Curated annotation (Swiss-Prot):
Taxonomy of the source species: Bacteria, Pseudomonadati, Thermodesulfobacteriota, Desulfuromonadia, Geobacterales
DNA damage as UniProt keyword: yes
Biological source species: Geotalea daltonii (strain DSM 22248 / JCM 15807 / FRC-32)
One Pfam family cited in the UniProt record for this chain: HATPase_c_3
PROSITE patterns linked to this entry: DNA_MISMATCH_REPAIR_1
Known function: This protein is involved in the repair of mismatches in DNA. It is required for dam-dependent methyl-directed DNA mismatch repair. May act as a 'molecular matchmaker', a protein that promotes the formation of a stable complex between two or more DNA-binding proteins in an ATP-dependent manner without itself being part of a final effector complex.
SMART domains assigned to the protein according to its UniProt record, in alphabetical order: DNA_mis_repair, MutL_C
Protein known as: DNA mismatch repair protein MutL
Keywords carried by this UniProt record: DNA damage, DNA repair
Protein family: Belongs to the DNA mismatch repair MutL/HexB family.
CDD domains found in the cross-reference section: HATPase_MutL-MLH-PMS-like, MutL_Trans
GO cellular component, one term: mismatch repair complex
Keyword Magnesium carried by entry: no
GO terms, molecular function: ATP binding; ATP hydrolysis activity; ATP-dependent DNA damage sensor activity; mismatched DNA binding
Gene that this polypeptide is encoded by: mutL
Amino acid sequence: MATRIKILPEQLTNKIAAGEVVERPASVVKELVENALDAGCSEVMVEIEAGGKRLIRVSDTGCGMTREDALLALERHATSKIANDEDLFSLATLGFRGEALPSVASVSRFTLATREKGSLEGTEIYAEGGRIKEVKACGMAEGTVISVRNLFFNTPARLKFMKSSETEAGHVGDLLTRLAISRPDIRFIYTNDGKTVFRALNADLRERVATLLGRTLSQDLYPLDFCDGQLNVTGLVGKPECSRSAASHVYTYINGRFIRDKVVQHAVLQAYRNFMERGRYPVVVLFISVPAAEVDVNVHPTKHEVRFREQGRVHDAIQEAVESVLRSSPWVKTQPVVQKTQASTSIAAARIAQVRESLTQYRPQKTTQQSFKMSTPAVPASFRETSLPDPVPVADAAPAPEVERGYFSGLSVIGQFNAAYILCQDGNSLVIIDQHAAHERVAFERLKTQHAAMGVESQRLLFPETVEFSFKEGAVIREHQTELDRVGFSLEEFGGSTWLLNAVPHLLSGNDYVKTLRDILEELQSLGRSRSFQDILEDILARIACHSVVRGSHCLSQQEIKALFQQMDTTEFSSNCPHGRPVLHTLTLAEIERMFKR
């Protein structure tokens, strides 16, 4: 017989509802801070301990609540923000469902202290697992203070899914960054385990972005102000060269609410399509303002997705707004193709690297035209012996493996095509070699060998470089600092969101190593419980290898080609680059003759 249908007890339904609203400590912070903003506060302070697992405390200077309202606030679907159907489609607040406080209280030890403006005393309510244990009067400043202790103490299954304290703190910092950017007129203070992570004072948007994302980045952002009827788009648009490997720095807001909407993101990427390489994401802060009746925010539990009444019009307006800034910006006028910007940056980086070489005498001087960094004798002798052998006759090598390993050295070089492909003859066949892919494979195998031995060889910088990271990136660095050191990046905290970069992988010296590091951090942020650093180690080494070699067209001398082929002969899997792309393609004489109908 089938199980009878029955009504679930309230305590169980509260936990089920909490699962939709409260996913991790950052979810709690989101709900509490949004309530504070809706209350008209001028300052929000967020304090956490153990990444929010032990304590989350949010204090605000908002309007506060009476004793009766405070008790009602812990009842499900009790809210002061909407009253009828019409209000649901003309929302002017971040919250409106009346689910946040009871959901949080049902999975924690919860304390709410509040005092309404003009009242002589406040009210303090203590609840445990959703049940109110104590209500009393208290003395406090006007506003509200909510403390959430021992999150998920009564739902151990959910507790198991939480990450390390550093990771959870990073998520909280990332969440607060989004909220603080949306309201530069409000002071935000964030502390973790008693240490102030950031203090964002009242400021304009650019200054707020500088505080949270870094002053260097803020200087590469251009203002945007676009109007199309009742649709307004304002904010800051980043240079294409500030791109990221993920959409973590695409901050989009609809009527003040942070969203991750596919329509909006597609419009932004379309605007950048001619200025940025595929697979990269820009840095933008966009505020989209439309009449409340033109957008539905009640389509997802987290309210990150929205539905526009005129989706096409919104998409086109956003794309046009961003494109208008990109078309008129100085870097586009002087260098209309982004590759030229990257090339000039590479030249400048190369010159800096050459000055460092001369000062430190770390490695023998090389010519500025040399593109293949792996051929420099700066690595330990053990690696030079296997990866960079001196030119020797093929006959001197061991006879058994020589047929396979000497393939590339045995090719007859015809020349280069488009300064990117090496044309060779092998008997009656034409062999076309992608020199960039070949360099990548050699560099990748060297990095793997170094990492397996004593770690990737690093190059200490003459002067440590200060780099500003987001709070989420900083949390990733702290969690994986040892592993990052083994792949060549030596970092130490310098205060706030600034870190000192002391050393970089040797193969990246002279290249944009900061961009490579940011890409690696983006990759590490995507790690789940089922994946570890070791699982993506080869992806990281492949990224370093890719960024270490010359991209695009570059003429190679006969000696450089010879050195490359010698290294290819001693490299495993030399037929493909680390990303799986082919290194060479062969056309037989018969195939060529068929092309010409012979």
